[in-house]
Amino acid sequence: MLAKTSETVVLTIGHSTRTLEEFVELLEAYGVTLVVDVRTVPRGRHNPQFNKEALPISLKHFGIRYIHMPEIGGLRHPKHESVNLAWKNSGFQGYADYMQTQEFTDSLLKIIGLARETRLALMCAEALPWRCHRNLISDALTVRHIKVEHIIGKDSLIKHELNELAHVDGTRITYPLFTKETPQRTLGDFGSS
């Protein structure tokens, strides 16, 4: 008889305008031992407690590790031949384009490896996951059979559901704008650059 293996889970969290104490309280409430910072720019004027220089030191006092993974960060621009036209937000469209790269896949596999070893949370600034690139990262994890849950509050954990715009082919995920009657179009079809 095979032993039951535990499910790999990835949590996500947005630091938002929380105090460091509130943030750590949430991490501790959900047993997080590693924060993976998925911000491209890990600093801000309004919440300096979450800057890359300060946060690792603060978290260490609570026994929580920190790593920064800018290679999976947001702030991506759409490609000219993007197939991810279902996204109206250019930042999400650009990130969906980036998800087609080997760099994204390698970073995602690194996150999965870490999640198999420890309880981690992917962190960005935006509190609401559906307004953040964590939502797209979560889609990519979900199609790889990784359970994703979003930390909203102390008593609020939301299970990630694959975005309805998603088109899945194995572990490849795109967000095309198409119907059964019309073929997929790209930005190039509209003369956009």
Can you describe what each PLM-predicted range is?
Residues 1-193:
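Residues lining hydrophobic/aromatic ligand-binding pockets adjacent to catalytic sites
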